[in-house]
Curated annotation (Swiss-Prot):
InterPro entries on file: Turandot
One of the record's GO cellular component terms: extracellular region
Record key words, sorted: Immunity, Innate immunity, Secreted, Signal
GO biological process: cellular response to heat; cellular response to UV; innate immune response; response to bacterium; response to heat; response to oxidative stress; response to UV
Name of the protein this chain belongs to: Protein Turandot C
Pfam families membership: Turandot (PF07240)
UniProt keyword annotation of Signal present: yes
Keyword Nucleotidyltransferase included in the entry's annotation: no
Factors inducing expression: By a variety of stressful conditions including bacterial infection, heat shock and exposure to ultraviolet light.
Role summary: A humoral factor that may play a role in stress tolerance.
Lineage summary: Eukaryota, Metazoa, Ecdysozoa, Arthropoda, Hexapoda
Length: 129
């Protein structure tokens, strides 16, 4: 009995790295998704509405980035997003764009579109190396 439990634990330890993390397939899927988002977002409204999806992709990609890469993109994100608070405490990885679902002045709309283009470009460069 003790040997079977030990064997089971060993098997779980060997298998668990394959179940966790960001796989090559997920990375490829996100890379294609970023390219599609950038390619099909032709007007300001679609860019603003799809910014949150780019933020979600960045959140999934974050563990695979170097601290320098992560810091560079996070500085830009913090300028253009609001922190999600749950009971007054920041949510883990919880940021949302400031711009979705709001009526924006032309200046704010320009900022939102610029943020979309900056974030999309940064993600695209990360995927293409």
């Amino acid at each position: 009995m003790n040997a079977s439990i030990s064997l089971l634990c060993l098997a779980l330890l060997l298998i668990s790295p394959f179940c966790l993390g960001y796989s090559d397939e997920e990375r490829e899927s996100d890379s294609l998704r970023v390219a599609e988002i950038i390619r099909t977002s032709n007007d300001a409204e679609s860019k603003i509405n799809r910014t949150q999806e780019l933020l979600d992709i960045f959140r999934r990609l974050t563990p695979t980035l170097s601290p320098e890469q992560r810091e560079k993109i996070e500085r830009s994100i913090q300028e253009h997003t609001d922190e999600i608070l749950i009971d007054g405490v920041p949510s883990q990885g919880g940021r949302k764009t400031k711009y979705v679902g709001k009526i924006l002045s032309p200046v704010a709309q320009g900022l939102a579109v610029g943020f979309f283009e900056e974030l999309g470009g940064s993600l695209s460069r990360l995927f293409t190396g």
